[in-house]
Every structure is written in structure tokens, then in C-alpha cells.
Amino acid sequence: MLKLFSAFRKNKIWDFNGGIHPPEMKTQSNGTPLRQVPLAQRFVIPLKQHIGAEGELCVSVGDNVLRGQPLTRGRGKMLPVHAPTSGTVTAIAPHSTAHPSALAELSVIIDADGEDCWIPRDGWADYRSRSREELIERIHQFGVAGLGGAGFPTGVKLQGGGDKIETLIINAAECEPYITADDRLMQDCAAQVVEGIRILAHILQPREILIGIEDNKPQAISMLRAVLADSHDISLRVIPTKYPSGGAKQLTYILTGKQVPHGGRSSDIGVLMQNVGTAYAVKRAVIDGEPITERVVTLTGEAIARPGNVWARLGTPVRHLLNDAGFCPSADQMVIMGGPLMGFTLPWLDVPVVKITNCLLAPSANELGEPQEEQSCIRCSACADACPADLLPQQLYWFSKGQQHDKATTHNIADCIECGACAWVCPSNIPLVQYFRQEKAEIAAIRQEEKRAAEAKARFEARQARLEREKAARLERHKSAAVQPAAKDKDAIAAALARVKEKQAQATQPIVIKAGERPDNSAIIAAREARKAQARAKQAELQQTNDAATVADPRKTAVEAAIARAKARKLEQQQANAEPEQQVDPRKAAVEAAIARAKARKLEQQQANAEPEEQVDPRKAAVEAAIARAKARKLEQQQANAEPEEQIDPRKAAVEAAIARAKARKLEQQQQANAEPEEQVDPRKAAVEAAIARAKARKLEQQQQANAEPEEQVDPRKAAVEAAIARAKARKLEQQQANAEPEEQIDPRKAAVAAAIARAQAKKAAQQKVVNED
């Protein structure tokens, strides 16, 4: 009795809620054996034919490749793709792929050479001697992925299962009403399928192996039973036909009675599921050493003349397969990749066959009926009754349409397997699956953005923490550097402080004068001398600063000198071209000569105070001096040739002479105050200039005496008064100069010139006095 009960439990199956029973159309294609399709002229191999990232390219344009040669490298979850035939790589560019929107993905385009040569194949017939890791790596590098429709890398799936897998389930249900690829594969290659199952069992070491197959495949069931006749480790479970019993969660519940938790995987409950086609691909990869380059594809529909199942090379254009099967398209012909419930309509027929392509359906206009117009939801709950995942499709529809992503997530939209049962039974013809696909894509995009934001935040926080640690370490180093001085340093500091205090005490001690002793004033004298020296140094610095600020630019000075020379030449030409009647006023000439001499002295001082770097060209200086002497001689000649009728008023001349002396004294004082103590005067030059000035003064007096009119008389008393005033002013000036500070130096040249002028004026006054007495 106990054995009977155990046997009953062993073969027990469960039933899931919901599901539908659409009309079956499998007989269109499952009656003919598998056949090969002629090679296409061009193959388009997308680099991404699986869930995950695309691999790294290992070929380039112009390379010759063989069948089975890797086109990409598989690292991590990146699954490699292989050349479906031998030929030449003509392009590597984006190309539209098997997607509802025909999205362009990077693809390798190969022109076949028609030879279909394989790479050297190394099979592992003794795979049981290989380790688990070696087998998983070989399966991964040979490009094996889930061929049931998901496209998940098989090697990654086996690696993730680990040692916690207790039940291995082989999915042979194939519940779509048109698809017969697995059915025909089990009929024609049952032994190879079972061998692939044994390889998977060797890797996972499960306690039980279950094959789930629907009862609408009698030929496949009989072939499997024949192969498993002597096997006791693999159980074949025949289940009732119900859509979608081929779903992973639904088949797991049917065979084990266990439900996969929301948001979880079947491996969480110790179950791992593989497709029949995947098992066959594993066998070819491990034992035969052949990468996956082809798969079984169902060609069905009333628009195809020769429906059936074919071995289609990956990368073959869909148009090539349909034309080989006798495709007769209508005006508004549609082609569906996949079944009528879970498939999608191809936007055009040049997309390639990929690893997840299991069916190409070309229905006629009457086969699927006219598309119905979408209407409003009537809340009939028929979709909820048909949902195999126990969801509320009508609520998910409203949430998806209203962009309420949080509520859609709360209502477990991620558990939707997109089987299309809800849309099949909907009386309002609402394409619910399309809404759910779009909502899940938007939620995935939001989650990805949140993930990137979280990663960015983590990086920012890590950076802030690192900066804080560096700051704390830096402060700690500063604190450790600011330690107390050593004992010897303390002694040195104390000694220095003692010396400072001693000096301060000595400075503040009063000076005591004892009777009979002279006081020691050396400290006071030294302090006074130091203060004087400091004051002189400050005054010298201030004087240097003022001199540097007032130094003329040598270039500007040269320009001004050139302009003055040009004006002088122009004046000479005008004077030379003047009429003989036009005479020169001696007073104006004397004034101009005095102004010219003053400007010359000022220019000499500016040049003397210029920076030592700027040097004066001696040749230019000599030329300018010669020009000045020539101008002076010419002026003297003009004065000598003046008309005798024009006379000079002695009183006006005396007044002008007094004004000139006052201006000269003021200019001398300014020049003495601004003069550098370093400037020295050559006594010989001063004597020469004084002699020249005296000679000119005598000559001028003689001219004035000769030109003076006898009729004009000068008052002797006024002249005597003016002479006395001049002598008094001269004495006062001498006293002021004698009382000046010893630091101020008098320019000998200026003094000589002033003395000569004074003597000339005195002589002139005396001569005028003698003339008046006569």
C-alpha cells in the first residue's frame, strides 16, 4: 500500500489557475521530417542574440572565416557568436534585427563562398572525465543559449545553479498552437536530446530529472519512451494540453507542485529548467565540438506552400527561408516571428534568423481574421480568469495607461509572462500585452536610472569620506609636528630671554653723576649719532624716490631736443631771410638767451639724474654743444649789428636785471635742494664759462655805451639808490648761503655765472654814473 501511494505521488501532476485552449494548428508542419535549406548568399549575424551585453569583436572587414569560427569573445555574461558558414567578412555595421521595432544592432555581414568548410572540431566523447567547470566553460564558449525563447546564456545559468539544484526539468511542452520545432526535433533526434540531458545532469547532479511534454505530441512521446526504456534516472511526464503550460513557472508547478516566489527564480526552490533544443545544442557542443550555428525553425501558415521544420543557419534572412518554402504573400501579408500569442509582427523580411527564432508564421487573410478595433474596458474580469500568473490584467492596464509605475510594480507586473491569454479572451479587443511590455520597459528604464544615480551617490559619498580621512590625517600630522621643544631648545630660549631682559634693564637704569667725576655720555652720543644716521638714510631714500619719480625719459628728452633744434634752424632761416629794416630787440634776445640757458641747465640736471643704465652718446652731445655755440655767436653778431637808433632804458634794464637775479637765486635754491650730493662740478669748466660770460658782458656794455643817446640822462641819485639796493640784496643772499646746512652744496658754475653777471651790472652802473656826471 505504501509503495502504491509513493508511486502515485511520484507521477502526480498539478494544475495551475487560468489558461486557455486555442485551436491547434500543429498538423500543418509536424508531419514532415527536418530538412536543410540551401545556403543564402549573404548572412547577417547580430553580435547580441541573447540576454546580456554583446561580445568583443575578434574579426575585421576582409577576413576569411570558416563555419564555427568565433566572431566575438565571450567574457562573463557576454556570449560569443560564430560564423554560420565559410566566407568573407564584407562589413561590420548596424543592421535591423528580430525586434518588434526592427532596431538596428551591430552585426557582422558575411558573403558565403559556397564551400561551407568547418573549423577543426574537437569533441569530448568522454565528457564524464571532465570537471564541471570545464564543461560549463565549453558550453559558454560554444555560444549555447536558451532556445525556447528567452535566450539566457546556458553556461551562466548552470554556473548560477551550483549545488542547490534538486530537480532538473526539460521543457518539451511547446504549448503555442502553431509551433512544432521541439516536436519534430524529438521525433528525429530523440537520442541526441537525451544525451544532452545526461550532460546537464552530470554537471548539476540533481536528485531527479523530469521531462514535461503535452499529450498532443504522440510521436515525440513514443520516441522518447523508446530511448528511455532502459533509463531509470529520467522521468517522462505527459501533461494535459493547456496554454501556457510551457511557461517556466507554470510547468514547474505542474510537475513539482512548487510555486516560484514573486520576483524570484526557479533556482530559489531548487529547480532548474532547460529547453529540448538547448539540450540538443549542449550535446553538439560537448560531444561533437560544434558551436551553435543553426537551429530548428518552423515555417507554417496558409501563405506558405510547403510548411514544415527546417535547419536554418543563424544569420539567414527571413525572406530566404520563406521563399524556399514557397511563400505566396498577399497584398497586406504579415509575417509573425514566434507564435500567434507570444510572437510579434516583423516590419520587413530582411531581418536575420537568430538563436531565439523558433517559428515564422505567414497566415492568410482568413486564417487570423480581420484586426478588430480597440474599445473601452468593460471590467468583465475575463482577463483575470485567464491569467496563469494570478494577476489582475485590468488593473495593470489602467496603471500602465496612466503611467502609475509604483502601483503597477505593487501589483506584480514583473510576473507577467506576456503569454497573451488575457488579450485572447478580451471582448474589447484591447492589446493588453503591448501595454504591459511598454510598462515593463519604462519601469526597467527608471530602475536603471535609479541604479546609476545610486552608484553616482555612492561614488560621491566615498569621495567625501576619503577627503575627510585625508583632512583628519593632515591635521594629525600638523599636531604631531607641533610638539614641545627639547630640553636643550628650552635652555637656549631661556638664555635668549635673559639677555633681552638684561639689556632692557640696562637701558632703563638712571645715569648717576658723582662729584669730581665726568659723566660717561658715550651711550647717549652713540644713540644720537645712530638717530642722525637713520634720519639721513631715510632722507636719502626719500630723495632717491623723488628723483626716480621725476627723472625724464631719455627718449622724450631726445625728441624735445630735436624739436628745439628744428625750431632754432627755422628761426635762423627766418632771421636770415628777414628784411634789412627789421632789427632785433636786444632785450628780447637777452631774455631768450637766459631762458635757453635755464632750459639747458634743467636738461643737464635731468640727464645727470637719469638711471645709470641709460648712457648718452658723446658724439651727439658734442654736436649739440657745437650747435649751441654757433647759435650764441650768431646771436651776438645780430646784437652787434642792431640799429643805433634803438636805445635801452637803463632803469628798465636794471629792473629786468634784478628780476633775472631773483629768478636765478630761486632756481639755484630749487636746484640745490634737488641736486644729488654725488654730482660734482669741474672747476676748470666753471672758470672757462665765467670768463666767457664776463667777456660777453663787457662787449654788451661797450655796445650799449656806444649806442646810448647823449640827450637821455639818468638821475644819479636813483642809480645810486638802485646800486645800494642791489649790494644789500647781494649781501643778504651771501648771508643766507653762509647760514645754509653743510649738506647743501652750491653749483660752482652757477655761482661763477651769477658773480660775473653781478660784476657786469656793477661796471655798467658805474659807467653810466660817470657818463651822467660828464
Swiss-Prot record:
It is a peripheral membrane protein. [4Fe-4S] cluster 1 binds at C377, C380, C383, C426. It is found in: Cell inner membrane. The keyword Transmembrane helix does not apply. [4Fe-4S] cluster 2 binds at C387, C416, C419, C422. The keyword Membrane applies. Residues 369-397, 407-436 form the 4Fe-4S ferredoxin-type domain. Belongs to the 4Fe4S bacterial-type ferredoxin family. RnfC subfamily. PANTHER family: ION-TRANSLOCATING OXIDOREDUCTASE COMPLEX SUBUNIT C. This is Ion-translocating oxidoreductase complex subunit C.
